[in-house]
Regions:
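Short beta-strand/turn micro-motifs at beta-sheet edges
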Residues: 58-64
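Vicinal oxygen chelate
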Residues: 4-13, 45, 64-140
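N-terminal beta-strand motif that seeds the catalytic metal site of vicinal oxygen chelate
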Residues: 1-16, 73-74, 129-140
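Hydrophobic pocket/interface hotspot
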Residues: 18, 22, 84, 91
């Protein structure tokens, strides 16, 4: 038996704001929604990953009050440093940037961090041995 990670379920204080955030910044799309929990339950996925990994987003959570130096986060890989900078610029305008773009030694790479409307941190990185193009990068 080999378990496979298929989803992450999140209770959030503002469902619509979280759905909008993940659409806008993470290019995720709603692939399913249904009535539930007094409102609705939403499944979101990256294009092409609808059958492999999703976020299940539900109403009813508490706002997470993470410290700026708390590195608990969801991580998304990008294809270039310029894309990291672009996300950071958009996040500055939206007032949700928590970690300015920075370079760290391998395997961390170049990254920035955003705060979603529920208080979760979301990292956007380039140069890690994960995600698009990572097959050419050795594991640490």
């Amino acid at each position: 038996m080999r378990p496979t990670l298929t989803h992450l379920a999140l209770h959030v204080p503002d469902l619509d704001a979280c759905v909008s955030f993940y659409e806008q910044f993470c290019a995720m799309q709603v692939i399913h929604q249904r009535a539930g929990k007094g409102s609705r339950i939403v499944w979101m996925a990256e294009q092409g990953k609808e059958h492999s990994f999703i976020f299940v987003i539900m109403p009813g959570g508490q706002d997470r009050q993470l410290a700026v130096d708390d590195y608990s986060h969801f991580g998304f890989a990008l294809e270039s440093r310029e894309q990291v900078d672009s996300i950071a610029a958009r996040a500055r305008v939206s007032r949700c940037l928590v970690w300015e773009p920075r370079d760290e030694p391998f395997p961390v790479g170049y990254y920035c961090g955003l705060r979603d409307p529920a208080g979760n941190y979301v990292e956007f990185s380039y140069g890690q041995p994960l995600g698009l193009g990572a097959e050419q990068i050795p594991l640490p």
